[in-house]
Amino acid sequence: PYDEKYMADLEAVAAQVTLAARRSQAPAIVCIGSQREEGLAFNRRFRMKDGSEQFGPDKQHPTALDIDENDTDCCGPAGPTDPEFGVIAVKRELTGEPFALIVDYALHVDVTSGDKITSDYPGIMREQLKRVYGEGLVTLFIQGASGNINHCAYLQHSPFPNFGEWKSRQIGLALAGKAMNVLEKALPSQSSTVEMLRTVLAVPRYPKDDMVVQKLLAAIKAKKPEELAFFETVFIKLYNEYSDEGTDEREVLTLRIGDAVLCSAPGELFVEWGLEIKKWSPFKYTFIAALCNDYVGYIPTVEAIQRGGYEATPIISLKGTSALGQMVADANFRNLQKLKAE
């Protein structure tokens, strides 16, 4: 529910922080860099032998992590990851010491799991960086295009926990080390331009009469009530309440900071869309900022919607048109071209 007091307080705090930042302005150098970070993030969707795709490699136990690949119908991961770990470091001009970092990586922030309120692995990373660079260091973690990416090393038979506080700490420490490596090698930006472009998309809602929706609905209705899985019960409820009429406004922001750009998405963008945005970017460093200023649910590829799976289930996981991913990518593409030309 909308909390009027919280929103009013939030505006006041934002204003106070802005004024404090303005008062503390000082000459600084922006340094930018990136490196590959592999072995921590994995594509969590798997292609099955019947051509479908799903969350996890085993149909009977989709979240299990100790699966023998010989005992499943899984053919392998259904997509790539984005291993780029990006850092934008703001350093003091006189000393070269960093006092603010933007860190970007494509990995779900849901490692600790359960119903705890936690800063998860970005919090561990932040605290470790403070131990090195001082308590005054501000670290902003931005989640990249990771709608279909998580931390679970499926089929690798790791003897270590794949979720919980131990795993969160492992990832946080590893990324803190990577952040230090990148920022210590990062070179000053050749450009001092800071500019942002905003595009508001009119996004059609996912149609209720779509083939994917109707096929799922028919399969659920063919079952007896006592046979329904939890998500099937939820789907029926949401389907009955859902209206596909009209459009919704969704915001896309593209922010340039020197030689780097941050390209936003209003939900959990699939990694394939993030890689496409990066491929066509004219900038040296292009980072993706998912879950920005809105939450439309998952933003999968059209192929993923056709093949099924948790993240690609209409009405439950996505409510916008199947073309939303392309709309977001294209909006960022146009903004990138304009920012480069200016």
What positions do the PLM features span?
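Non-catalytic substrate/cofactor recognition surfaces at enzyme active-site rims
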Residues: 1-342
